[in-house]
């Protein structure tokens, strides 16, 4: 997923604010500290869409659903896909080393907190999980999700 628009502002105390408009229509409003800690408010577009599958080597991610619902997909090798539907007011924590992806339903809003040793090289693509998730329709997601 590429970024269409980016705007950045230095807030002080080694913290910067960043706005990104993603190719899938999501709007991301981020606060990032020089130590790698990170907060992001993500607003989905008018259509549901998958993000890009990935894993982190050292970062823990905490996703909280404010509005709507998301599907959390994880991968355990041998092409075993796990799907979980996360609804308003609920959250999920993703630990380092877990291949994962999110499907954001239309109009959903989530908050993401990242912490741990967050470096530019910590994000690693997971094409294996993309192959299992990107073609799933919203209907299939809701049928397979728990």
Give names to the regions the model predicted.
Residues 76-96:
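Short acidic-glycine-tyrosine-enriched beta hairpin
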Residues 1-40, 50-52, 141-146:
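A short, N-terminal "cap"/entry segment at the start of jelly-roll beta-barrel domains
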């Amino acid at each position: 997923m590429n970024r269409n628009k980016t705007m950045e502002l230095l807030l002080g105390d080694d913290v910067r604010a960043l706005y990104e408009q993603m190719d899938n229509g999501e709007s991301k409003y981020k606060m990032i500290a020089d130590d790698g800690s990170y907060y992001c408010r993500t607003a989905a577009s008018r259509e549901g869409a998958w993000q890009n599958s990935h894993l982190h080597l050292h970062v823990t991610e905490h996703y909280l659903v404010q509005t709507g619902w998301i599907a959390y997909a994880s991968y355990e090798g041998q092409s075993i896909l796990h799907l979980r539907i996360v609804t308003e007011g609920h959250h999920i924590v993703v630990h380092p080393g877990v291949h994962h992806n999110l499907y954001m339903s239309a109009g959903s809003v989530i908050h993401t907190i990242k912490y741990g040793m967050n470096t530019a090289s910590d994000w690693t693509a997971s094409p294996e999980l993309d192959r299992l998730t990107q073609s799933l329709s919203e209907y299939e997601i809701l049928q397979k999700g728990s």
